[in-house]
Amino acid sequence: MKDPSEKDRLRQEAEALLQQWEGRYHAYGLFELFDAHSDGDDIVVSGGKRIPCLRQQQGNSPYLCLSDFLRPLNLSPVSSFQTSDSSTIGIFSTSVSLALETDFDADPYQKMMAQLLADRLAEAAAERMHEQVRKDYWGYAKDEHLSIPEMLVEKFQGIRPAVGYPSLPDTSLNFIIDDLIDIKQIGIRLTESGAMKPHASVSGLMLAHPQARYFSIGKIGEDQLLDYARRRGLPLELCRRFLAANL
């Protein structure tokens, strides 16, 4: 938005709405920490539940997969991708009051503003929860002291890849996350493809490896699609539908 006055006006409107919503609508968060290890391109959490991941096939090496940032089972930390921080994983989800999606239906502009703010609130809840996990619950960054601008440019250790985003593009992985932490506890319901309702919801993983970074899977080949369908235990054509944007 190039016009500073328009930007300021929208900010003022958003802040006024947030003040009106105080006590009426809420953001919710849920997380759990699990012992975990990698098995090829799968993340295996305690109890044996697997989270199949995808690996980059385009561009230059290294061809990354999120499982790279967890230690293989029974392997000591000897490589650059294996440290004492790489045997635990966080699984999380955040959402907002479902009423935010319906209370403003009569006013298209207010509905648009409500949806934009609801999305930001769900993301902000995830950011705040991730900070608390790093510093207190997981505790691998007890001495972290970052300003909000520093947090927004991710100067902290670890990553928080979300389902449906470039490094974890398959939204149907939400079914696995639901099995692990029961996201229904915070009011989230899943569609048949794994999309979340309310729309302003976020789910994903927390990885603490000091070299963990965000990346985009990009396009994958038929060979990886076949392997992924096998690891998911799902029909090939269903996985093809889930990963259409990556084929």
Residue spans for each PLM region:
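Compositionally biased, low-complexity/repeat regions
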Residues: 17, 26-46, 69, 131-230, ...
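Active-site loops and adjacent core secondary-structure elements that bind or stabilize anionic groups
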Residues: 1-112, 116, 146
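Surface-exposed loop/turn and secondary-structure junction residues enriched for glycine/proline
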Residues: 4, 57, 72-73, 81-84, ...
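Long alpha-helical repeat solenoid scaffolds
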Residues: 113, 243-246
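Conserved mixed alpha/beta catalytic, RNA-binding, or beta-rich assembly cores of soluble enzyme
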Residues: 95, 102-137, 214-215
